[in-house]
Amino acid sequence: MVCTYPDPDVVVFFAGTSLMTSLSELQQRFLNIATDGRLSPKQKSNFLALEAEACIPYMPISEALREAMSDGVICDMFEGHAPFKPRYVLPDYAKFLSQGSEYLELPSAEDFDDALNMLTIIYHHVPSVTNIPVYLGQLDDVLMPYVGDQTEAQIYKKLRHFWIMLDRTLPDAFMHVNIGPTDNIICRTILRVDAELKQIAPNLTFMYDESITPDDLLRQATKNICDCSKPHIANYPIHANAYGGARFGIVSCYNSLPLAGGSNTLVRMNLKEVAKRAASRDDFFSNVLPTYHQLMTELMDARSSHLHEQSQFFQGFLTQEGLIEESRFAPMYGIYGMAEAVNLLLEKEGQTSRYGQDEHANALGHEISATLAKLVDSTPVRYGLEGKALLHAQGGISLDLDVTPGVRLPYGNEPDPVTYVQATAAHHQYYRAGISDILTIDETVKSNPEAMFNLCKGALNAGYREFTANVASNDLVRVTGYMVKLSDIAKYEAEGSRTNTTFLGAEAAKNTGILERSPRVVSQEMSPVYK
């Protein structure tokens, strides 16, 4: 038996039930996981399962693509060598509650308690790349029909218990709840509970629509950011228009995807590495970028074809009971390293302009985003949403070294928040599947939360799809998009953590410099593998 791990060019062999000496390194890796005192038994099981997936021979790809992946230009996000589940799944939970489930032997929900109980059950049957659901639903829309004569106090107590249950039984900060844009008791209660508990999980997005959402509700959401760096605030009209209505959700870290569908795979391109291989700006746009775009398309097609044609995933109960539709899944076309790409291309021209610091450099970045959007829109894929992939400014992973997530400005060199927004807002129109800029704000904003409210409204009015901020003194912060506690990172090496994303945060803090984000006073004018 041949085992390819983790690089497709590294081959080891099984001989009957015993292992040859060449497997000692692989065995040692398994043993390291099994004896790692920082991991719980469940976390060890998950990592060992990932190692097993990595031993499956990689699906057929061209030598050019294999070389691009080996060189770090293109990355498959460690999703496994033979995909058997989509990366992100967004079931229609409202439909589930209204019809019940034959597979789960559940009748339709009749009241609030039924609804919470049924959601608690189905969440354990929704797969994702992390094995924990990344989408828990637009919970106010899902739960409001079942409120009945519940008092505010009763709703608060039940939702608080529900929130604690989510963090303790599904401890992964990629798990995401959506609320808003309407004003209702579920939305306000979730904001209250989230601010009180300050949990890593679940992640939370508040949908904002200027024509629907009252200012005092947005103020409650931005006050929460001051207290616990949540929620993430999404520009509802822009997202809804991108999907022809309201059938979408925000999941994981800033991924906007079709409801009752999701993402079959996420592949990403390192723009820094692409720019390195270009002789000039013209060469970048005319030759190098289109070449790697075709390789990106090849990898998305290879991975999604295996999932849709060989894994049998879409024969399961989620599809059979109408909670997801195969046609509503699409590959995510991720990019990162925009800052480094722009700076490298300008250096090749002998220019000293820097991304995020002057209009000339920023304009080049916007041109790259526009070109990527045209390439993605003009290129059909085998299993896409209406035949297309979805462009996404990918938020980075814990293993990234010397490269900035998505189109963000480099850590530690950010200008004031207003300048930051002005530099990056023009990118947002191009990234249908989501984009993020994490602004780090000085703790003095806590004494002036109106400043956070005004900054948020200004960013959304400038065209931001999503607004996200960390407050410098908060223990609970965003890393690439998921939440971690700085106190957990500090003690992780010695004690481990109950929460699945703490190791990613610890690794990211060490490798990417995320904790070097520059806090700015608002009034100055704004992993995936075991190691």
Task: Describe these PLM feature segments.
Residues 5-9, 13-327, 348, 354-358, ...:
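Conserved catalytic cores of very large enzyme subunits
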Residues 325-341:
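Conserved phosphate/anionic-ligand binding catalytic regions in large, soluble enzymes, centered on
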Residues 352-375:
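Short secondary-structure subsegments characteristic of cysteine-rich extracellular domains
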Residues 340-348:
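Well-ordered alpha-helical scaffold segments within catalytic/enzyme domains
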Residues 289-297, 336, 366, 370:
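Generic structural signal for well-ordered, non-transmembrane alpha-helical segments
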Residues 264, 330-333, 367:
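Short, well-structured alpha-helical interface segments that form or flank functional binding sites
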